[in-house]
């Protein structure tokens, strides 16, 4: 957690403006403080301000009689210090205060409460559950109830739903337990507080403070707190986001890589909305309001994307404004793999607690943890969603059998979400070789190094489709003549069933590749050695494979039969796909340039 809720007790009492409050402690207990006023923010730096900058008073309490007053009045809270000492069970008397019309889940009668709201003069109150305490303005709440009486009628359900949300989507999800002896695993002992205020620091409408969440006192935010339908339909967006900021791991321990990091923030809100859809029939809120579309609209599109047979590249295929929704769909699918019901995520969060840091520059940490948890290889799932995987991750996962369910067909909002999930056949799956130790050289027809600055051939082996190799070119005759060659040393003799290629969709896309290997696989010290006899394994061209010049993600090409090879040579003899270059224009020889982003080999398992 970023911030544990401060140990503040609600008293259900309110101090009148300027009126003397007497607090008597009939015990030798030390380490308590009384606070009058729930609006703890100091707005001195704001000018002009909408309320006085400091509106609370506080005072340490000692055994015996204590007095305090606040010229503006306010709720009465008691805060416990870390070094409090004395009896755990003692009597505290508070005199001179008014009873606040708080709603306390499990003990407040709705009818009597509404009547109290109408007759009391106390301006602020709390809505209290076991794990939440909301400080709200009586007048604004009463106006909302007058407009919609179900707000009051459903208040017990609303606070119970909030308690369940905090316990399930935050405590349990982050592997926290109420009363745990291990403090690293212990859920907060005090409720999550939300205080509505007329003005916030830094001109914000909501922020996380050391005593809870502070939000603007508006109908919109009060509705997020007090409306059962708003909560259960997943429309309490601001409050859920604030809670996520408090419970989520700091960036240094986050397991979430860039492709899904925005979606993760919405997991608690989505789970609440899905529950509301199932239990109450409420249409789900947009979850990502900034996208301008709903989950109900975008999820089917996301599932259709993942279910296609063509290769995918998530960050390139999906528009940035809807990526969070698409990514969320994939995370929900994983949560329900084999009816796991989010248990993997809970275990993941438990493991991270023991880590000093987590590398989330790629998906590798998350992917390995997922494979270890289910003892299955989830490469097909990542490929269907177009998520990048490193060779290291693929090699690690290959020790497990492939996942056996096509979970990318799971439809979260369907009446029977798993109805379309079928068995996933493992035969014919392309297992990719780990290229970590490979060496690669790019050469022109004259045997010279052949790559443009910053686009060396080793980028073909880095598992990153945003980088790649481009042969050298210039706007003059120094652009080298064809053919070009890529020479690869795999460092050991390897069973190979074919090759894959990615990112061959630029103006410089290759139109013909001839894959060759030496007749003799003895160690080669010089790939330019004229005594090496090369034999052709397969020829890949845009005539037999019309898709070749348009491959953005991976294209896979089988060898006629399995080969045992250590060395490969890729010969590029033809001009690129762009027919705008004119060879008679001697200042432009870019028709020769070749470029793609990934190259590797694959094999089949028996």
Whereabouts are the PLM-identified features?
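Disordered, acidic Ser/Thr/Pro-rich linker "stalks" and the adjacent N-terminal cap
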Residues: 423-492, 504-509, 602-605
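Beta-strand-enriched, solvent-exposed domains that form extended recognition/catalytic surfaces
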Residues: 1-101
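Active-site-proximal alpha-helical
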Residues: 134, 296-394
């Amino acid at each position: 957690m970023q911030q544990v809720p401060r140990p503040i007790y609600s008293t259900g009492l309110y101090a009148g403006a300027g009126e003397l409050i007497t607090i008597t402690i009939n015990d030798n207990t030390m380490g308590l403080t009384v606070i009058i006023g729930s609006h703890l923010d100091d707005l001195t730096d704001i000018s002009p301000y909408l309320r006085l900058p400091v509106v609370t008073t506080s005072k340490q309490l000692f055994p015996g009689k204590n007095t305090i007053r606040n010229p503006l009045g306010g709720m009465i809270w008691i805060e416990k210090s870390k070094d409090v000492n004395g009896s755990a069970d003692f009597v505290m008397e508070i005199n001179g205060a008014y009873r606040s019309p708080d709603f306390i889940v499990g003990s407040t009668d709705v009818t009597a409460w509404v009547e109290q709201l109408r007759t009391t003069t106390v301006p602020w109150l709390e809505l209290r559950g076991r794990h939440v305490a909301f400080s709200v303005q009586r007048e604004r709440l009463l106006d909302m109830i007058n407009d919609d009486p179900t707000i009051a009628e459903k208040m017990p359900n609303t606070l119970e739903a909030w308690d369940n949300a905090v316990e399930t989507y935050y405590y349990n999800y982050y592997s926290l337990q109420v009363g745990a002896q291990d403090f690293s695993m212990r859920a907060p002992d005090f409720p999550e507080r939300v205080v509505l205020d007329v003005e916030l620091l830094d001109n914000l409408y909501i922020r996380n403070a050391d005593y809870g969440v502070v939000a603007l006192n508006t109908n919109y935010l009060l509705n997020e707190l007090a409306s059962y339908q708003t909560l259960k339909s997943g429309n309490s967006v601001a409050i859920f986001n604030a809670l996520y900021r408090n419970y989520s791991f700091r960036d240094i321990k986050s397991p979430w890589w860039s492709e899904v990091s925005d979606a993760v923030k919405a997991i608690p809100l989505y789970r609440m909305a899905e529950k509301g859809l199932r239990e109450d029939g409420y249409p789900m809120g947009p979850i990502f309001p900034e996208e301008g579309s709903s989950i109900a609209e975008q999820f089917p599109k996301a599932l259709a994307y993942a279910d296609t047979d063509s290769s995918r590249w998530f960050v390139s295929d999906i528009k940035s404004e809807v990526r969070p929704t698409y990514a969320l769909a994939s995370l929900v699918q994983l949560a329900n793999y084999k009816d796991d019901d989010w248990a993997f995520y809970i275990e993941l969060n438990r493991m991270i607690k023991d880590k000093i840091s987590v590398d989330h520059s790629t998906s590798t940490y998350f992917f390995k943890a997922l494979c270890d948890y289910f003892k299955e290889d989830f490469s097909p799932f990542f490929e269907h969603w177009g998520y990048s995987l490193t060779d290291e991750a693929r090699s690690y996962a290959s020790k497990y059998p492939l996942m056996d369910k096509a979970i990318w067909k799971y439809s979260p909002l369907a009446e029977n979400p798993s109805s379309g999930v079928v068995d996933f056949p493992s035969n014919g799956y392309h297992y990719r070789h780990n290229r970590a130790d490979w060496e690669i050289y790019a050469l022109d027809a004259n045997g010279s190094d052949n790559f443009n600055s910053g686009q060396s051939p080793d980028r073909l082996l880095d598992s990153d489709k945003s980088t790649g190799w481009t042969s050298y070119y210039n706007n003059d005759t120094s652009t080298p003549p064809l053919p070009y060659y890529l020479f690869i040393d795999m460092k050991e003799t390897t069973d190979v069933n074919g090759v894959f290629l990615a990112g061959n969709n630029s103006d410089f896309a290759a139109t013909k590749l001839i894959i060759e290997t030496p007749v003799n696989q003895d160690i080669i010290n010089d790939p330019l050695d004229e005594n090496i006899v090369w034999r052709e394994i397969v020829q890949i061209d845009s005539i037999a494979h019309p898709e070749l010049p348009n491959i953005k993600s991976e294209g896979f090409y089988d060898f006629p039969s399995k080969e045992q090879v250590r060395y490969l040579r890729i010969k590029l003899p033809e001009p690129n796909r762009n027919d705008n270059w004119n060879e008679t224009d001697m200042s432009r020889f870019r028709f020769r340039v070749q470029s793609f982003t990934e190259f590797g080999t694959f094999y089949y398992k028996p």
